[in-house]
């Protein structure tokens, strides 16, 4: 998908996949950028570990506690997380869905949810509910994000709970996202 995108814009890049493990990540990153690499995309299980190797990280990466992109600029490595922005762009441009004033349910409280929730909140939904099989994990995610995201001036109803009928069926939803 990345190579197809580059080809659409006549960008001269090589996009390949390399097998990297948590044990080899630091050496691989050092060698890649030392050899003139400009940037990389990162997937599981390395997103959280990769955060530690960026000289600077974006607010999105900080909120997600993970990065899926590291790029070189001015002799520094910058880490970012584009998961949330990618979802928003797809919803708005391809599906013509706006999130403002919508009631949204997110199923799951792992890394994918953590990566998309801040971008969803930026779009001013009416409510955002995180439901997870392990209720405590949903509650911890909500609590952590509330401590990092400025919710002042927002009328957002932000809830978290388990996958119970009482919690899930208490509301209707405009959008359900399985993360």
Kindly give the residue locations of the regions a language model identified.
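Phosphate/diphosphate ligand-binding glycine-rich loop within oxidoreductases
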Residues: 1-95
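Short acidic low-complexity segments
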Residues: 153-173
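Glycine-rich adenosine-cofactor-binding loop
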Residues: 81-84, 91, 95-125, 133
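A short helix-to-beta-strand connector/capping loop
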Residues: 11, 35, 73, 149-160
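NAD(P)-binding Rossmann-fold cofactor-contacting core
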Residues: 123-149
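A structural signal for isolated positions on well-ordered beta-strands in alpha/beta enzyme cores
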Residues: 14-16, 105, 128-129, 159
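Redox-cofactor binding/interface segments in oxidoreductases and associated redox assembly factors
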Residues: 42, 177-178
């Amino acid at each position: 998908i990345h190579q197809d995108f580059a080809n659409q814009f006549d960008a001269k890049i090589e996009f390949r996949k390399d097998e990297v493990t948590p044990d080899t990540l630091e050496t691989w990153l050092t060698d890649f950028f030392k050899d003139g690499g400009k940037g990389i995309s990162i997937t599981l299980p390395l997103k959280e570990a990769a955060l530690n190797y960026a000289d600077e990280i974006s607010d999105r990466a900080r909120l997600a506690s993970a990065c899926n992109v590291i790029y070189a600029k001015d002799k520094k490595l910058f880490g970012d997380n584009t998961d949330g922005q990618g979802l928003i762009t797809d919803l708005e441009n391809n599906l013509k869905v706006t999130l403002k004033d919508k009631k949204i349910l997110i199923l799951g409280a792992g890394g994918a949810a953590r990566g998309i929730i801040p971008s969803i909140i930026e779009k001013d939904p009416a409510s955002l509910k995180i439901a997870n099989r392990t209720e405590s994990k949903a509650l911890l995610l909500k609590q952590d994000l509330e401590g990092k995201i400025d919710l002042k001036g927002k009328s957002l109803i932000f809830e978290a709970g388990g996958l119970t009928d009482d919690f899930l069926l208490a509301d209707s939803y405009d959008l359900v996202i399985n993360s």
